[in-house]
Amino acid sequence: MNPMIFTSLLATIMLGTSIVLTSSHWFLTWLGFEMNMMAIIPVLMKKYNPRSMEAATKYFLTQATASMILVLAIIINLMYSGQWTIMIMENPTASMLITIALVMKLGLAPFHFWVPEVTQGVSLSSGLILLTWQKIAPLSLLYQIFPSINTNLLLIMSLLSIMIGGWGGLNQTQLRKIMAYSSIAHMGWMIAIMIYNPNLSLLNLLIYIMMTSSMFMLLIINSTTSTSSLSRAWNINPIVVSTMMVILLSLGGLPPLTGFMPKWMIIQELTKNSSVMLPSLMAILALLNLFFYMRLTYSTALTMFPTMNNMKLTWQFQSTNIMPMMMSLISMSMLALPLAPSLITLN
């Protein structure tokens, strides 16, 4: 793809998200979503092959359906309230339809089926945009309308997402699908806490984007897309692969890594609101994610294939060429847990 065209598409994606973030009018919000969707489809098809075309088609159909539901909900809300303002949600049917539309855009269960397939069919760089930047606009709209949303519906969807995000990743060997199921589970955590503390949900989103971006950058450096290629990469660049394993454990929420911080704070906040069963179920279901992350780490780092001695010597003199900004991002993805006490105090 021409670099100028690619840059223009990325700028349009950012502009569409910015319109959604700053708008208080339903029409401008819908316009921002449409700009975002139409600009990212060529990005998903950057590597022009049948798999990327299929992935882009699935993404388009899902997002177009969600946009249709969103427009229907906006019209119903306009009929009852006579207002285009986002904060005014007087009709429960419109509120439920908007929730379903945003959940489809986010890829939460039971509307999650497109996320692993689309992520697997696109390149690593496109998958990075899909699983990080594309979550910002729907979550920001949920943040604005959460007082009018059916809380029971959101809690059921969040628990389903955490469970499916764990179960779905158990038998996966493709790293992009593993990251997709990880995204589904993390979205479940964000939606569950948004009802009680929306600001904590935004903090969780920030940490999730930081960890997922670090993981995808390291996958791009190593050009690894499956567990077998990850095992072979250990002989070539063990430092980078070791860092990837630590970030995977951080995504699973293993203390004392960064990923433990949002889960700890969410469970604490839910407990403060006299909810004991919900955080208990969430913590138990999160063990599924941690299990396949630890299994992947074990199979990659601790069970190496027999190799010749000269193969083991190659990585000792190889430079990694990692940018300082990227190193800072990776460090924060692994070592930000000491910030938790101050954040809890502020909260």
Swiss-Prot record:
Membrane-spanning residues: 1-21, 25-45, 68-88, 96-116, 122-142, 145-165, 178-198, 201-221, 239-259, 274-294, 326-346
MF terms in GO: NADH dehydrogenase (ubiquinone) activity
EC number(s) from the headed UniProt entry: 7.1.1.2
Reaction catalysed by this enzyme: a ubiquinone + NADH + 5 H(+)(in) = a ubiquinol + NAD(+) + 4 H(+)(out)
Alphabetized UniProt keyword annotations: Electron transport, Membrane, Mitochondrion, Mitochondrion inner membrane, NAD, Respiratory chain, Translocase, Transmembrane, Transmembrane helix, Transport, Ubiquinone
Pfam families: NADH_dehy_S2_C (PF06444), Proton_antipo_M (PF00361)
Family annotation (InterPro entries): Complex_I_Subunit_2, NADH_DH_su2_C, NADH_UbQ_OxRdtase_chain2, ND/Mrp_TM
GO cellular component: mitochondrial inner membrane
Enzyme class: translocase
Subunit-structure text: Core subunit of respiratory chain NADH dehydrogenase (Complex I) which is composed of 45 different subunits. Interacts with TMEM242.
Name of the molecule in the record: NADH-ubiquinone oxidoreductase chain 2
